[in-house]
Amino acid sequence: MISTMIPSRGLIEEAFPGFAVSALVAATAQFLSDHYGAPAMLLALLLGLALNFLAEDGTRTAPGIAFTARTVLRLGVALLGARISAGMLAALGPGAIALVVAGVVLTILFALAASRLVGRGWRFALLTGGSVAICGASAAMAIAAVLPRYEKSERDLVFTVLSVTVLSTVAMVLYPMLAGLFGFTARDSGVFLGGTIHDVAQVVGAGFSIGPETGETATLVKLIRVSMLAPVVLCFSLAIRARGLADADGGKAPPLLPGFVIGFLALAGLNSLGLIPQGVSDFAGQVSRWALLIAIAAVGIKTSLGKMLEVGTGAIALILAETVFLAVFVTAGLHLLG
């Protein structure tokens, strides 16, 4: 029995320095966010990029940073399920739900089609399209966890997280003005904001800047998009296995049903049945947020800024096009439903 515990202790000892550094970066980012208003995810990423030397081979922190960027990330995604329940769907009505679901699916399909025009592969299309369509940085990290590894995996993930976070912040300021320009009601404004802005925090900020009804509706719509994370990640995983794309590219085939997806679905199911008390759900949400913040700090530390800048204008154009496509689609859908 003692022998079986030694590897676990060894893993903890090996991973702790890198995890501690990542947690410190995340805490610093949260402090700056609380005092200056910038998104914590963006700050954690930028601070992490400045500490890339800590992830170099041979450093004591490198193993823990790699562990945090992968395992802690998956824990954060799994715990998101505690915030999801089937009761959310009944509150919106079938028309709005159909619009939100269609927006997610069509944005991902648009990304796959548009990526060919800018010379980007299917991995990059799924990564950016899924992050724009679902829930920004959290979706990007979840999708990256099931995509086959390749030479530019970390660079593309950091670019995607950075881009969707910046675009979310811009949208938080711009989209409420567009909702007024389009003449949307408070409810429709909430559907528009929740259905188009990438990250949850910016959705909340944009929604409540208009009013309580808009803020509550926007948050609800956003959580419905978040609830699509597990099905979308599962579909990606199944498609990759079925087509043999991972083996063809020399990568490691992802599992049929990743453990963090099972965790997400299990928690969502328990919450839907009312088996998770509100206090526990709120606590799980906070743990999830911190796990993702620490993980994105680790991802930033692992990534070379110089290599990230090699991503090119085509990638920037693609993620902008995906963002515009989703906004136009939801706007058109609201006008048709209205």
Swiss-Prot record:
GO cellular component: plasma membrane
Subcellular location: Cell membrane
PANTHER family: INNER MEMBRANE PROTEIN YEIH-RELATED, UPF0324 INNER MEMBRANE PROTEIN YEIH
Species the sequence originates in: Paracoccus pantotrophus
Record's keyword annotation contains Plastid: no
Keywords noted in UniProt: Cell membrane, Membrane, Transmembrane, Transmembrane helix
Transmembrane segments: 36-55, 75-92, 96-118, 125-147, 162-184, 223-245, 255-277, 290-309, 314-336
Bilayer topology: Multi-pass membrane protein
Pfam families linked: Cons_hypoth698 (PF03601)
Cross-referenced InterPro entries: UPF0324_pro
Record-given protein name: UPF0324 membrane protein TauZ
Family: Belongs to the UPF0324 family.
Disulfide bond positions: none
Lineage of the species this protein comes from: Bacteria, Pseudomonadati, Pseudomonadota, Alphaproteobacteria, Rhodobacterales
Domain of life: Bacteria
